A protein has these predicted regions:
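Hydrophobic residues in well-ordered beta-strands that form the structural core
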Residues: 1-2, 26, 44, 158
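Catalytic PLP-binding core of fold-type I/II PLP enzymes
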Residues: 1-14, 46
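A cross-domain feature marking catalytic cores of carbohydrate-active enzymes
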Residues: 2-4, 28, 119, 194
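Short clusters of hydrophobic/aromatic residues that line enzyme substrate/ligand-binding pockets
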Residues: 8, 17, 28, 34, ...
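PLP-dependent aminotransferase class I/II
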Residues: 11, 47-219
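Glycine-rich, phosphate-binding/catalytic loops in enzymes
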Residues: 16-18, 208-209
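Active-site PLP attachment segment
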Residues: 19-56, 78-81
């Protein structure tokens, strides 16, 4: 089961993410590259998984049989579905725009010695959902800095969603396993937007705020 909620259009070794496992689960939340406002879809080439998914989203009803299990009404309405299809037609243009803007932001941030971008595997294509960096200077407190940036309008997902290892969340604590690398990496991680709607002025403002953030966040 692939969690590819943010991976629309991304590839690895020439193959689309979401096609490696038995099923790929995508989100179509309003901030994703393909959006229906809310919702998502499952990508699978297994007939049994596709059939089970159709039953689940249609109240547990199987065609020609009727109710076979308890289900829910998870069907996407016609209007959001039409919106999603229109977004799909724009995906290639979005990927191109995000690459251009991402490269522009990377170049502008390259002089900040306290920031290091997570390496993108050479045989992969990154869709530009966001740029992900590590704050490598141990003297910089990442959380206050992220909070200050958010107030300035540059919001990191690690701050927005309060990232932490999942086993630190109440739901998963009974299954906790210590993941020392996650414990070390997450508190030093920060993300920056690079969507195709950013203008040159937006990028200049964002880079200026990021450059000022370590001192401003510490004050």
């Amino acid at each position: 089961l692939e969690d590819v909620a943010q991976a629309h259009g991304s590839t690895w070794k020439g193959r689309y993410l979401g096609t490696f496992g038995d099923a790929g689960c995508f989100s179509t939340h309003e901030r994703k590259l393909i959006t229906t406002g809310e919702g998502g879809f499952i990508l699978t080439d297994r007939q049994d998984i596709a059939a089970a998914a159709r039953v689940l989203v249609r109240y547990g009803i199987e065609n020609d049989v009727g109710g076979v299990k308890l289900g829910s009404n998870y069907k996407l309405g016609a209007i959001p579905a039409a919106l999603g299809l229109s977004q799909l037609a724009k995906l290639d243009a979005k990927l191109t725009g995000r690459k251009r803007i991402g490269d522009q932001i990377r170049a502008a941030l390259s002089g900040l010695g306290w920031l290091t971008e997570f390496e993108i595997e050479p045989s992969s294509v990154h869709n530009g959902y966001s740029l992900v960096y590590q704050v490598t200077d141990p003297k910089i407190e990442v959380w206050p800095m992220s909070e200050w940036l958010a107030k300035e309008g540059v919001v990191s997902d690690t701050w927005r969603y309060r990232y932490k290892p999942m086993y630190n969340m109440p739901l998963f604590q009974p299954y906790a396993k210590q993941c020392v690398n996650a414990e070390r990496i997450i508190p030093r991680t920060i993300t920056f937007p690079c969507h195709e709607g950013l203008s040159d002025e937006d990028i200049a403002f964002m880079v200026d705020r990021i450059a000022a953030a370590p001192k401003a966040g510490a004050s």
